[in-house]
């Protein structure tokens, strides 16, 4: 697959591709929200509204089939950009046995390990050592050159032991890893001033001895410039890169949460703006896309999402009485469990 981020960062094709992933993810997640509120989805629904610019830029900057990407719960845009088909998402949330989780998880823990996307771990921060381990394994196999491993976390995850251990190991080993911190100002409902004492999370980069970047996560052009540079430095041997994106999630922690703890002052502030609307203006103002093109994309993606939802709704859900438990049997002989 073509790597648009290679060479000229402000590439027209690159930016259009990023925006398309942002838009496709937003339309998909709006549909998921409606399905959840209608009682069609069992379990939680976690959206990436307001964080699409960061997520889609990273997913587009990585090379499918070569790089590794461990997405966060709010990374539908990045998943889409990295090649995950929409049907994987709708099948998972709607419990289809045809989905990547075979109906066993109606949530966001799916992955595409064969394509370099490990399954998402709910304990945020835990994917930092996972990506470090995947990269280290490739070094031991002699196939690390030219690869990058990336993951996204939230501001709260920077307080975890897994984040510290994983980033410290990656720094010592000079692994080509990019960690994107989406600082949406609240770790669930815990504000930044109760989460860390430094003025800016990017200051942590100096302590670990890794590259550090800070970017306005609501600005597509800024995200494209900074994230592509971080990926480039990691790929060229510069070691781990920490990118802190300042933004605000535009919904609650999940669709079960109204986010009442976020003040109107914060919501109406600079980072409360919608990155999709910002990106749309940037594309049009810089003659990278027309209003008619964007309208056509919206219509196309809405139809694509509707088809994916309809297909998943027609498919069977798991039948526990006829479950063969092959997920366990592929690793351990089923007779061992029976004997015990």
Q: PLM features: residue spans?
A:
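Cofactor-binding active-site loop characterized by glycine-rich and histidine/acidic residues
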Residues: 30-33, 40-173, 191-197, 202, ...
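Short, well-ordered beta-to-alpha junction loops that form the rim of enzyme active sites
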Residues: 73-74, 245-247, 317, 325
């Amino acid at each position: 697959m073509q790597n648009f981020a290679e060479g000229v960062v402000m590439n027209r094709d690159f930016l259009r591709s990023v925006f398309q992933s942002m838009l496709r993810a937003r339309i998909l997640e709006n549909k998921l929200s409606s399905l959840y509120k209608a009682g069609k989805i069992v379990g939680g629904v976690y959206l990436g509204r307001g964080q699409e610019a960061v997520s889609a830029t990273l997913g587009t900057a990585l090379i499918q089939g070569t790089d590794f990407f461990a997405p966060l719960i709010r990374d539908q845009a990045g998943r889409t950009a990295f090649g995950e088909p929409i049907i994987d998402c709708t099948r998972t949330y709607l419990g289809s046995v045809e989905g990547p989780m075979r109906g066993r998880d109606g949530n966001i823990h799916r992955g595409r390990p064969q394509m370099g996307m490990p399954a998402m771990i709910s304990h945020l921060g835990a994917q930092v050592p996972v990506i470090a381990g995947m990269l280290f394994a490739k070094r031991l196999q002699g196939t690390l050159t030219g690869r990058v491993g990336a993951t996204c976390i939230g501001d709260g995850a920077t307080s975890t032991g897994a984040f510290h251990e994983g980033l410290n190991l990656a720094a010592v080993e000079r692994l080509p890893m990019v960690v994107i911190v989406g600082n949406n100002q609240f770790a669930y409902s815990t504000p930044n001033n109760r989460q860390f004492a430094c003025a800016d999370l990017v200051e942590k980069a100096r302590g670990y001895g890794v590259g550090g970047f800070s970017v306005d996560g609501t600005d597509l052009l800024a995200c494209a410039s900074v994230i592509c540079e971080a990926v480039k430095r990691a790929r060229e041997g510069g070691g781990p890169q920490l990118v802190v994106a300042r933004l605000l999630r535009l919904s609650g922690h999940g669709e079960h949460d109204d986010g009442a703890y976020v003040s109107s002052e914060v919501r109406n502030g600079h980072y409360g703006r919608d990155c999709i609307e910002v990106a749309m203006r940037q594309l049009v103002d810089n003659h990278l896309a027309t209003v008619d093109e964007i309208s056509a994309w919206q219509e196309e993606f809405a139809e694509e999402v509707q088809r994916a939802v309809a297909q998943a709704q027609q498919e069977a859900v798991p039948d526990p009485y006829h479950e063969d438990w092959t997920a366990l049997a592929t690793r351990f002989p089923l007779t061992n469990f029976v004997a015990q």
